[in-house]
Amino acid sequence: MVKQIESKSAFQEALNSAGEKLVVVDFSATWCGPCKMIKPFFHSLSEKYSNVVFLEVDVDDCQDVAAECEVKCMPTFQFFKKGQKVDEFSGANKEKLEATIKGLI
C-alpha cells in the first residue's frame, strides 16, 4: 500500500513511524507524464515488498516537503532509513527503482 502524504508533519510522522524499515518516497505531480507512467509500477512494488514503506508526495500539494527534500524534477525517488536519506535518483526508471529497493533492504 502506498500512503499519500498531505503535509510536512505527516511526512515526518511517516519517516519516524517506519522505524528500521526502508522508506521509498515518490515525488511526483499530476501533470507529469513520466510520473503517471511509473505510478502503477510503484504501487505494484508496494505490494511486492510489504516490509518496505512506500510514500507518495505531490510536489504541488506539498511544496514545503519537496523544497525541504530538494526535489528539482519529477519523478524523484528518495530512500530513507531511520529518518536519514540514504539514496536518491530522478527519472521514471523501473529497473533502477526496483534494483535500488533490493539493494537497500
Swiss-Prot record:
Subunit structure, briefly?
Homodimer; disulfide-linked. Interacts with TXNIP through the redox-active site. Interacts with MAP3K5 and CASP3. Interacts with APEX1; the interaction stimulates the FOS/JUN AP-1 DNA-binding activity in a redox-dependent manner.
Q: Which terms in the GO cellular component ontology are assigned?
A: cytoplasm; extracellular region; nucleus
GO MF annotation, one: protein-disulfide reductase activity
Source organism per entry reads: Equus caballus (Horse)
List cystine links: 32-35
Q: Which SUPFAM superfamilies match?
A: Thioredoxin-like (SSF52833)
Name recorded for this polypeptide:
Thioredoxin
Site, Deprotonates C-terminal active site Cys: residue positions: 26
**Domain Thioredoxin per the UniProt entry, residue ranges:** 2-103
Sites bearing N6-acetyllysine, chain numbering:
3, 39, 94
UniProt entry tagged with the keyword Acetylation:
yes
Q: Which residues carry this modification: S-nitrosocysteine?
A: 62, 69, 73
Which family, according to UniProt? Belongs to the thioredoxin family.
Q: What modifications does the entry list under PTM / processing?
A: In the fully reduced protein, both Cys-69 and Cys-73 are nitrosylated in response to nitric oxide (NO). When two disulfide bonds are present in the protein, only Cys-73 is nitrosylated. Cys-73 can serve as donor for nitrosylation of target proteins.
Which InterPro entries does the protein's record reference?
A: Thioredoxin, Thioredoxin-like_sf, Thioredoxin_CS, Thioredoxin_domain
List N6-succinyllysine occurrences by residue: 8, 94
Q: Residues at site: Contributes to redox potential value?
A: 33-34
What PROSITE patterns does this protein map onto? THIOREDOXIN_1, THIOREDOXIN_2
Ordered alphabetically, the record's keywords are: Acetylation, Activator, Cytoplasm, Disulfide bond, Electron transport, Nucleus, Redox-active center, S-nitrosylation, Secreted, Transcription, Transcription regulation, Transport
Function of the molecule: Participates in various redox reactions through the reversible oxidation of its active center dithiol to a disulfide and catalyzes dithiol-disulfide exchange reactions. Plays a role in the reversible S-nitrosylation of cysteine residues in target proteins, and thereby contributes to the response to intracellular nitric oxide. Nitrosylates the active site Cys of CASP3 in response to nitric oxide (NO), and thereby inhibits caspase-3 activity.
